[in-house]
Amino acid sequence: MSVEVVKRFKGNIEPGDHPYLQGPWSPQHEEVNADDLVVLEGSVPTDIDGVYLRNTQNPLHQALGRYHPFDGDGMIHLAAFRDGKVQYRNRFVKTKGLAAEIEAGERLWAGLMEDPALSKRPGWGAHGALKDASSTDVVVHAGKALTTYYQCGEGYRMDPLTLDEAGIPDWSPEDGISAHTKVDEHTGELLFFNYSKKPPFMHYGVVDKNDTLVHYVPVPLPGPRLPHDMAFTRNYAILNDFPLYWDPEALKRDKHVVRFYKDQPSRFAIIPRRGQPEDIMWFEAEPTFVLHWLNAYEDGDEIILDGYFQEDPMPTNYDGAKPGYERMMSYLDQHKMGTKLHRWRFNLKTGKTTEQRLDDRIM
């Protein structure tokens, strides 16, 4: 095995006992290429030919206050498989925010758990004061890897084989691209949504296999929301409006206070993949919040959607957490949120929703 250090980045993370800055979460500040990795046990099948890409959070600079793992700078890790051998390389996602902080030698933007007033420059995303770290997801579309940010960012492209930079997509809209885009392997299309604090509060878009934006429509909501993921079937896209969102009264004071409104229903927008706002069918269901979807498909007049239902989207503080991190640790504990596999069935003829718990285990 040979290892080449391509570049070392100078960071200023202070040593400490933060649970998400040590062990497997320790920041990695080197970009490397490694050929012919050592196989510790067994062998790599010779018929595997392709690459595995993973997006991770690797903060380079000390947080302005309390660090949350979602704040870390994006870093793509690549494992390439061919002829029974594996190569590895990693690269930072060279976002505008990261470039500015490298030049300044310090953190310039507040994070998820910090006061937005700490930000030293205007930010990105629905929040408006955060750094677009492009550290949430990575998909491959139109021959390029596309990285995205959890509260809507510009999206950054890379070569999926070399991780060379390929810039921001020309079609990236003003309100950005959501955390999780979806690629239809049958049509080559990329489906996405975004959201903001201004009407209509959400948009839905389609980018064709040639990387051209061919569809972009508003999905009107009652107010600012915090959707994270979407799903799709052969003919429909599925978006959501969950009763977990910023307190409207606090927003008037520029305070981003997340609350769970348990007396309000979950709402699902089902729209034909090239549909208009008037084509949207809205369905209601039990109040919850779903961070990620598992699957969706059509079955006769129904659309079946599987995802992870949170029994308590606003859990109590995490006992034993480091002072100041009680809330963060509670959100990162699936047991406290009661996250369980759930199924929704939407009848397109009757407009009714039926629900079913698929497993009582915490997922």
List where the protein language model places each region.
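Beta-propeller domains
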Residues: 1-363
